[in-house]
Amino acid sequence: MSKKNIFFIYTFLLLLGSLSSFSLPPYNLIFVNFITYSLFLYLIVLFKEKKAKISNFFFLGFSFGYGYFASSLYWVSHSLTFDKQLTFLIPVAILGLPILLAIFYGAAVIAIHSLIKKDYIFLLIFSISLSIFEYLRGILFTGFSWNLISYSWSFSLENIQILKFIGTYTFNFLSIFIFSVYFNSLWPVQFKKILINSFFSNSMCGIWNLII
């Protein structure tokens, strides 16, 4: 894979991460996560098939994470404009904070690079890894647990009632798993798998609603 193609994919992942930020309040466009996370996972597997370097896997996760956090935490820099003594921190909020948080996404991908396969077992492994590193993000260095992707469900009080039984981070794991389930329908687009994945994701949501 050429450097030009790799750079293009990193840029594309930045855009995917930014698009995922629109699933959070006040937009709550939750459907975009089914696209962004499935493509994210698809590109991880594609890099494995192309035998990319280990460092490339880190930057795959980092690019997606940076796009997500840079877009979803814009309000932090805006809040610093109300006090002139704090305006020097605006570049830190815009650039530094998303970089620090995106490292966890990069680490989550590189931690599982040797296990990458084009199957549902890897979907489970990916979901576990990313949810674990999201948990670490919430507890290390005083913690910064804002903007978990599971916050996408906050538009519905009924959906988040499940937190009572499984907690925030298990809920985050389930969210990542459900959002990424279509990745295996993309080699090439396979309508049979799309139907199976649609049935699976709808069944999960149905069981979810029965529980709550």
Q: Residue locations for each model-derived region?
A:
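Membrane-embedded alpha-helical bundles of multi-pass enzymes
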Residues: S2-I212
